[in-house]
Amino acid sequence: MSKISYDAIIIGAGFSGLYQLYKLRDNLKLNCRVLEKGSGIGGTWYWNRYPGARCDTESHAYTYFFSEEIFKEWEWSERYPGHAEIRKYLNYVSNKYSLKDDIQLDTEVISATFDEENNSWILKTKNDEIFKCKFLITAVGCISTTNIPNIKGLKKFNGDHYHT
């Protein structure tokens, strides 16, 4: 199976992944690809669309600062924006800078192995694709995988217990 090669691959198309794509592609002129597990961009804002989901950071701070143009053009409707407006903002930025041209949706990376002999990363996806890159950035966010702590004695505890 042939490997698709890029200078850099970014895993995740949320806030950080989109920012990395812009900086690496537009500023450093690297050949980049974002691999996103979901069917749309936005990261946590793509996955979490429940009623009332919103940002707990003020909108003026929850903004990209790499472009004064974006900062001036986009107007948030609320001090603490909801998930739909945040997704709309991310799509606006993505469209403005043609970021979607370098994003591959519905692509889950299942392994990333560093090839020391060739000084490169080899990535495999759930769709049986193989990618190769010199630089790998994991922009999967801190809430993409459940992390249940191993608490001594928890299995013997008979009461209710919760983890968030």
Please report, for each region that a protein language model flagged, where it lies by residue.
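A short, basic/flexible loop-to-alpha-helix module at the beginning of a structural domain
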Residues: 1-6, 164
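N-terminal Rossmann-like FAD-binding beta1-loop-alpha1 element of flavoenzymes
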Residues: 4-34
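Short amphipathic alpha-helical segments
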Residues: 21-23, 46-47, 148-152
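A generic structural signal for alpha->beta connector loops
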Residues: 29-31, 100, 158-159
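Glycine-rich active-site loop/strand segments that organize a redox cofactor
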Residues: 39, 46-89
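Feature captures the FAD/FMN-dependent oxidoreductase FAD-binding
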Residues: 76-144
